[in-house]
Amino acid sequence: MKHKKRFKHNLSHVNKLSADLGELIPINYYEALPMDSIRQSVSALVRLAPLAAPIMHKIDVRIHTFFVPNRLLWKETDASFEDFITGGSDGLDATTHPYKDLSAISTNRGDLLDYLGVPPGAQPDDYNILYARAYNLIVNEYYQDIDLQTELVISTDSGADTTTATTLQKCTWDKDYFTTARPWEQKGSAVSPPLGS
């Protein structure tokens, strides 16, 4: 059997933005289908705005890449993502794709939704909320301090999503003696060693 030829697409682009220190900003996102392979490289030119006093600290710019499957973002109890795509065994599956109604929300420049493709000032009726769910899942798993911060709420239901946060998050500082200091000695209850009777 002869293999089908795979097509190649050049998706290169320029992303110009300004950001505050510590913000977790999505700079790109792709929807990947089964058997898709994506090869990417990133180059960055970083400039600082004029400051009243120079920064006396090391500044690291980190660009991380993640793959988040839809099955982690959309867990349906009575149906599956496959049923949504195929229509189920009878072809009549009516599962609604997760969305957020943005008609009552105003998007501003520099918001998470701005970085995820919703232009500032635009108010589309429905927005594919899976991108914001993926962002929040990545923040929960990789960037939050589990001792000091509460997890972001992520809905995994179909239809209208009213609980998934759509605000830009900040990352935690690198681990050192100061940032890992806690007001308690250990997690959980204290150990009481059995002493002789």
Predicted regions and their residues:
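Intrinsically disordered, low-complexity segments
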Residues: 1-197
